């Protein structure tokens, strides 16, 4: 538990710095965050994911590069920090570790992300809240709505 709190605090500090760097110089900040992201993850999935992202974002003519640069420039700093923390730490680190642990100890296989159709009649607010709560218990921290 203390280890998770320490890792969480370190991730928040790192993300705060990275977001400030991206806001001040988006091109340089994007390169730095991807280079840094390749150092941090220990799992094969995370390393592969960040290698792909690095390759995509190294092409300044890429639509993804333009999108990320626009997000970095136009999205509120606090929202960008929260979003980055949720994807980077909660989903890729903490959640992935919990999914792996649950698979090893209970034989449960949980997805890394869940897509929710909010327009479907059976997916009312209470159902979605329950799904997210149950998903978090399994290590799922990324929801596509």
Locate predicted features.
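Generic alpha-helical secondary structure signal
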Residues: 9, 28, 62-66, 78, ...
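N-terminal [4Fe-4S]-dependent radical SAM core
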Residues: 43-115, 137
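Well-ordered, non-membrane alpha-helical segments in soluble/globular domains
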Residues: 85-89, 124-131
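Core AdoMet radical
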Residues: 113-126, 135-145
């Amino acid at each position: 538990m203390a280890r998770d709190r320490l890792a969480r605090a370190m991730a928040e500090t790192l993300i705060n710095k990275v977001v400030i760097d991206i806001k001040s110089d988006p091109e340089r900040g994007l390169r730095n965050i991807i280079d840094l992201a390749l150092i941090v993850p220990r799992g094969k999935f995370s390393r592969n994911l960040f290698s792909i992202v690095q390759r995509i974002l190294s092409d300044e003519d890429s639509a993804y590069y333009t999108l990320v640069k626009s997000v970095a420039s136009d999205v509120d700093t606090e929202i960008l920090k929260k979003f980055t923390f949720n994807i980077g730490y909660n989903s890729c680190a903490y959640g992935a570790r919990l999914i792996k642990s649950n698979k090893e100890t209970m034989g449960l296989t949980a997805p890394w992300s869940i897509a929710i159709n909010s327009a479907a009649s059976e997916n009312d607010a209470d159902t979605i809240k329950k799904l997210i709560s149950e998903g978090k218990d399994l290590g799922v921290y990324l929801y596509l709505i």
